[in-house]
Amino acid sequence: MANDYLFTSESVSEGHPDKVADQISDAILDAILAQDKYSRVAAETLCNTGLVVLAGEITTTANVDYIQVARNTIKRIGYDNTDYGIDYRGCAVLVAYDKQSPDIAQGVDRAHDNNLDQGAGDQGLMFGYACEETPELMPLPIHLSHRLVERQANLRRDGRLPWLRPDAKSQVTVRYVDGKPHSIDTVVLSTQHSPDIDLGTLREAVIEEVIKPTLPADLIKGDIKFLVNPTGRFVIGGPQGDCGLTGRKIIVDTYGGAAPHGGGAFSGKDPSKVDRSAAYAGRYVAKNIVAAGLASRCLIQVSYAIGVAQPTSVMVNTFGTGRVSDAVITRLVQEHFDLRPKGIIQMLDLLRPIYEKSAAYGHFGREEPEFTWESTDKALALAEAAGTEPVAALAE
């Protein structure tokens, strides 16, 4: 890769139609896990103008009012007016859940005991990543993209910019020099708005109130290109503007394209699904490796076969930044982390109703108390085993 290059990531707000679907799916998952933590859940959501469809496979003893959970989620996001294209009070909600296939269940239904040989819920490959670009050990472009749409939502909620509406998208382009962030090149922010705000006022307010307070001062060098609502009017948005589906924002959910993705979405899936739990474990492993000072950049790949507990492969790539070899780090991963599905569930305490919060603004790089996969509690042990110095601010 060239020494001087641009890299871009995007994010979307909680009111984006695909994120509405993700949040409904995870709200339903949480409601089920709150009553029956051993449930099998694959909750998919479709949302369109005035309509929500709930489908998938659920096996549980929980008694959940799925329709009310969906309405409550839509209300929390801010779709409380028919002018917005969907209103939590009047939208139709259709429910079409089946039970998990017994052919799948036979390989994963050993979860009620302490048997660590619970098989993976499906085959697949998952990635985890961490780097030193931010204190959260996340790539800078996706981190800033998340913070922009998060701030848009906060300003909408507290009434400082009352003409904002729930749907929004952000995109940040960062200039890298010698592999490190040098400056911010371009910021794109498109936000849904009420029809009575003129474009000039909107653009000035978004730049001054949303964008500039979010950008790190040390990365503002020269003129930044600000593109706010570049097509102009953005009144029709949310599920009215586009049909939303669970699992369509998997790059937004992870590393913004800075690392590979195995293809499996997260939202609506209980932790027996390694699409979710193993990706969380991959982040946990990679973050602890970087926090331990073993490398300044780390990518983990794990893979599984359905019904089999042990990963079929574990790969570590530190892109030449390792203080010890990738082979040594791989051995340390196998010694310090149990990457069997049940081992991951126990290690990260995943059988809890913690997932709705993860369904907007990124599953990674957020220091929420529920997000155990963001802990660096193994950094000191890894550093001691490898003979490196941990990152002081991150090793717990």
From Swiss-Prot:
Instruction: List residues binding K(+).
Output: 44
Where along the chain is Mg(2+) bound?
18
EC numbers listed for it are 2.5.1.6
- Coiled-coil parts of chain: none
**SUPFAM superfamilies the record matches:** S-adenosylmethionine synthetase
Family annotation (Pfam families): S-AdoMet_synt_C (PF02773), S-AdoMet_synt_M (PF02772), S-AdoMet_synt_N (PF00438)
Q: Which GO MF terms does the UniProt record name?
A: ATP binding; magnesium ion binding; methionine adenosyltransferase activity
Catalytic reaction(s) noted: L-methionine + ATP + H2O = S-adenosyl-L-methionine + phosphate + diphosphate
Question: Does Iron count among this protein's keywords?
Answer: no
**Chain positions covered by the region annotation Flexible loop:** 100-110
Q: What cellular component terms from Gene Ontology apply here?
A: cytoplasm
Q: Kindly state what the record says about how the cofactor is bound.
A: Binds 2 divalent ions per subunit.
Name the positions where ATP binds: 16, 167-169, 233-234, 242, 248-249, 265, 269
- Transmembrane ranges? none
Q: In which pathway does it act?
A: Amino-acid biosynthesis; S-adenosyl-L-methionine biosynthesis; S-adenosyl-L-methionine from L-methionine: step 1/1
Which cell locations does it reside in? Cytoplasm
Report the cofactors: Mg(2+); K(+)
Top enzyme class? transferase
Q: Which UniProt keywords apply?
A: ATP-binding, Cytoplasm, Magnesium, Metal-binding, Nucleotide-binding, One-carbon metabolism, Potassium, Transferase
Q: Which GO terms describe its biological process?
A: one-carbon metabolic process; S-adenosylmethionine biosynthetic process
What is this protein's function? Catalyzes the formation of S-adenosylmethionine (AdoMet) from methionine and ATP. The overall synthetic reaction is composed of two sequential steps, AdoMet formation and the subsequent tripolyphosphate hydrolysis which occurs prior to release of AdoMet from the enzyme.
Report quaternary structure and partners: Homotetramer; dimer of dimers.
Protein name per the record: S-adenosylmethionine synthase
